[in-house]
Amino acid sequence: MDTIPKARTPNVEAREKVVILFAGDSGDGIQLTGSQFTDSNALFGNDVSTFPNYPAEIRAPQGTTAGVSGFQLHFGSVDVFTPGDMCDTLVVMNAAALKVNLHKLKKGGIIIANSDGFDGKNLRLAGYADEKNPLTDGSLDNYVLHPVDVTKLTRNALEGTTLGMKEKDRSKNMFVLGFIHWMYGRKIEGPEKFLEAKFKTKPELLEANRKVLRAGYNFGDTSETFTTRFEVKPAPMPKGTYRNITGNQGVAIGLIAAAQKAGLELFYGSYPITPASDILHELSRNKHFGVKTFQAEDEIAAVCAAIGASYGGALGATASSGPGIALKTEALGLAVMLEIPLVVVNVQRGGPSTGMPTKTEQADLWQAVHGRNGEAPIPVIAASSPTDCFEMAYEAVKTAVEHMTPVILLTDGYMANGAEPWRFPEAKDLRPIVPPFAKPRDTDEAEGGTLSAAEGRVLSEVEAFLPYARDERGVRPWAIPGMKGLQHRIGGIEKEDKTGNISYDPLNHQRMVDLRAEKVNMIADGFRPIRLDSGPESGELLIVGWGSTYGAIRTAALDLQKEGHSVAHVHLRHLFPFNKGLRGLLQRYRKVLVPEMNKGQLRQLLRAEFLVDAQGLNKVQGLPFTAQEIRNAVLELLAR
């Protein structure tokens, strides 16, 4: 039994919401600490939003600012839409983590610093002049500073174990996790269950981490330094079953749910790339749903395998980030020509080229809409949050299957790795997905035409299977190889209308280009009517957003509306083709602002399509917008 010192009764301060930022070296277990505390708050009933911020280098020199890993969590008893602009509590494991993140802490905020990470060496590596220690030089007097020797306390907790010093020090994050659970009144049963699952085959490591976790909690209970705990009550949420979900998990579960609803096997062809790889990991854990995952040798093989799976009657899907999507481009043109279902997920990151793999961006919109040779229209949709990734992945499948077309779903690194509570939908509430399968026919293929197996004669065009005959939506039938009488040609060379034979006829090419474009345009007929996310139906200014800018825009818009400003917010999920009601909506406002993490790609599409004088707010720093940045831009535009 662990010896538990006598507890005292601290003050309890109620908070509506809290933003906490964990930061340290990439080997300090920061992401695990943040994700476990997030899970505890989600299970408690708080609304949560997270922002894991990874260093760009796989393992930067220890103790340097380049190697700082961060995890920001916003949790509350009210709706939470962003990870927060500024944090209330900053937990840092070394001097570099403080230097990188101090500007994100509110004045008067709490700093919990591992004092062992502020020795001379760490101060030099972090770039503090003359090894000046911020924990002792008075520079942090505007904050509530709590230096804690986490390293020493962790080693003390593991005294008497057979673990080496390095193994003991790897448990430091468990001390921090235990203490933070005490500080915010959360039980540690959740992290203990996690440890039991993680170390079930390593009892010594299980016991060590559990000891340190409890030591951190008990430290808060007995230390005279910490006199206040914080209480954040559960948020009112609709009844149902919830789990914490990241954007990549949402995409994976959405693909599975849609494939099940459509009665199709899901085939996912992928090549590992940051930040999309977790989709492959999640799908590979769900093979009991009939999911087939294939890790290809390169991006081209991955997408071509997915196309082949769709040709064979499965739901083909693939994912990548910008550089990988560039490699898939020729194959996407093939999928357009074949007119078969294919879901392509682009988890956007900082570019161009290799760019900043661990940082977020929205700069692949033009690539998605226009990035293929020839006239090759593909529907493009975008998710707005981790939970919306489920909805939009499901919609991507529905569109791809029912309209026989590839579909591009845009997410980004921010929402892919961020998490929020997700309510499990009822299967009956999911919209039906009906594949347009062709029916088998009593015919055989023969040179020069199609033969009737029963009569041994060449069929007329009326009687023969026409793979490119279309229904009223412009959709061709899905003919599965091996089905009797449905033999037809495929390939990337232009097809003859209806028959699918190879054709170089000029007028036929014009017709096929027009038919493919019309089919994609008609998809907009099935969109739900466009609606505002908040604000008046007409007025002074409309904020038009897309993708992961949703939370920051919504937070800013709601605050501005409360202050009496004539500001509305609409968030676009259909980026090509646009919703048919968008033109009329844009015309009802004097000014339009488009915040996006690129140099104005959606803004220019809106200008080209609707001749609207849209103004841009553009950020390409590898970081998401804050609500304050949106607010400042709106007020500036209103004042013009």
Q: Where are these predicted regions, by residue range?
A:
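Gly-rich Lys/Arg/Thr-decorated short loops/hinges at beta-loop-alpha junctions or inter-strand turns
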Residues: 17, 156-158, 225-240, 258-265, ...
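Short gly/pro/ser/thr-enriched loop/turn and capping motifs at secondary-structure boundaries
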Residues: 55-59, 118-122, 153, 300-302, ...
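Active-site cofactor/cluster-binding pocket
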Residues: 2-262
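Thiamine diphosphate
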Residues: 17-106, 253, 266, 274-370, ...
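Flexible, low-complexity linker and terminal segments
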Residues: 237, 245-254, 262, 392, ...
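Short glycine-rich or small-residue beta-strand-to-loop segments that form or flank ligand, phosphate
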Residues: 18-25, 176-178, 266-269, 316-319, ...
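Conserved thiamine diphosphate
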Residues: 84, 90, 138-153, 197, ...
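Peripheral docking tails and interdomain loops at the edges
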Residues: 26, 150-152, 159-163, 177-182, ...
